[in-house]
Amino acid sequence: MSPLDCAFTPSLPKTALVTGGAQRIGRVLCVALARAGFDVAVHFRHSQIEADQLVQELQQLGVRACAVQADLDDATSAEALLAQARAQLGVIGVLVNNASMFEYDALTQQAPLSVELFEQHWRANTFAPMLLTQQLAQQLPLEHTGVVVNLLDQKLCNPNPDFLSYTLSKAALAQGTVLAAQALAPRIRVMGIAPGLSLRSGEQSDADFAQKHNQTILQRGSTPEDLAHALLYILSAPSMTGTTLMVDGGQHLTASARDVMFLP
């Protein structure tokens, strides 16, 4: 069965907010949702041109779409995001927390920890997704159900010390996925998707990315399209909550002492 043929629960409003939706993985997720019949709010921070272009593309697929701006590193801006989406599309049934801050730091002299960078990761990668999850629940009428999907990382099961603040913020979001699933059941399901090497990491070259992409036990990493298929499966699987789908080609099963961008 094609992922686009999945049956969705009738009580689930077919409206979605995708953070970081204008580019890269988020863009693919938005297109997949639209093709499955969801109206889509495309969140962006700086990429307004890309967001507006994507909105036009989604509308051509026969759904409603809008672009909504927010800086998820700023609590006031993040707090207004879901209300913006709801004002244009109505009740939001699906929240995809895809946006992520990903800046390098480690417990080394070359890239030491700083309070500023640590807190930026925490606000963007942990607090904002949990705040939006709470807001989704608050605006959802009693007769409706909802789904939250958090984009995590396979390295939570296969840790290395690179990108320390990022990793800690994603680890907190993974635990938040479980806690939110417990708190918001039975009307709202909360799930995680943990990608592997899906796009170039940092300053990784295209050639190196292609090589590393084939070094998992399945000899392929995950593609943005794989993640979109996982998202649609979650939306169509009403018995799933509080767990994470590993969509990584088995990358989490092979120990790695460093981030993939530093490996030979």
Give short role names for the model-derived ranges.
Residues 216-227:
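A conserved structural motif in NAD(P)-dependent oxidoreductases
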Residues 22-24:
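Conserved glycine-rich cofactor-binding loop
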Residues 225-247, 252-253:
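C-terminal substrate-recognition "lid" of short-chain dehydrogenase/reductases
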Residues 12-14, 63-64, 91-92, 139-153, ...:
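Active-site loop of short-chain dehydrogenase/reductase
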Residues 33, 174, 184-198, 240-247:
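Conserved Rossmann-fold SDR core element
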Residues 101-102, 109, 113-117, 146-185, ...:
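Catalytic loop of short-chain dehydrogenase/reductase
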Residues 38-53:
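Conserved glycine-rich Rossmann-like NAD(P)H-binding loop of the short-chain dehydrogenase/reductase
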